[in-house]
A protein has these predicted regions:
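Beta/alpha (TIM)-barrel catalytic core signal, keyed to glycine-rich beta->alpha loops juxtaposed to Asp/Glu
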Residues: 1-179
Length: 179
């Protein structure tokens, strides 16, 4: 968290980290990198979590120009936690935006974590409904489950065997699912 740092100290440390990642990209060890937000989407205005992604993108531009390798923003997003699409917590060029809108404006790809609300979503929603919800707004979705039956169902649904899914709707729009 930023709790023990001033704003300037935090962004100075981010610049050091971005320089390190850009070096690894230049060396061919990685192609792209990003940042993951733990509670920022749930508590978007809490100073200890809040990060201006435009400022991070500007640091990447300062370090490596427009062809920098800062590409991904990962955050919690699911049918029971839609704040990334409903709360205008980011400022881009003086305009208030949601996290998802800001990522799009900065040409950053969004990665949804916890699309099943840590399993709580299964108590209220069908798998296909939860996948459909996240895939409409996100570029990528990281899925997983401790339950082998859920993993099997996820794979069947994602491959298009909708008759085997527990839900009614078809999900679409997401380029990648990583399991």
């Amino acid at each position: 968290t930023k709790l023990k740092l001033t704003e300037d100290e935090f962004y100075e440390k981010m610049e050091m980290l971005i320089r390190w990642y850009e070096t690894k990209c230049f060396e061919g060890k990685i192609r792209y990198y990003g940042i993951a937000f733990e509670f920022m989407v749930e508590e978007p205005f809490e100073n200890k979590w809040h990060i201006e992604i435009e400022r991070i993108k500007n640091i990447a531009r300062k370090v490596s120009g427009e062809k920098n390798h800062f590409k991904y923003i990962l955050f919690e997003y699911h049918i029971m936690c839609d704040w990334a699409d409903t709360v205008k917590s980011q400022m881009i060029d003086g305009v208030k935006m949601t996290m998802i809108e800001a990522c799009k404006a900065l040409e950053l790809e969004t990665v949804a974590s916890m699309p099943f609300a840590m399993g709580d979503g299964f108590k209220k929603y069908a798998l296909s409904d939860m996948l459909d919800f996240v895939s409409k707004k996100m570029n990528h979705v990281i899925v997983g489950s401790k339950n082998p039956k859920h993993i099997e169902e996820i794979l069947r649904c994602w491959r298009g065997n909708l008759s085997e899914c527990s839900g009614r709707q078809r999900f679409s729009g997401t380029d990648l699912v990583e399991i």
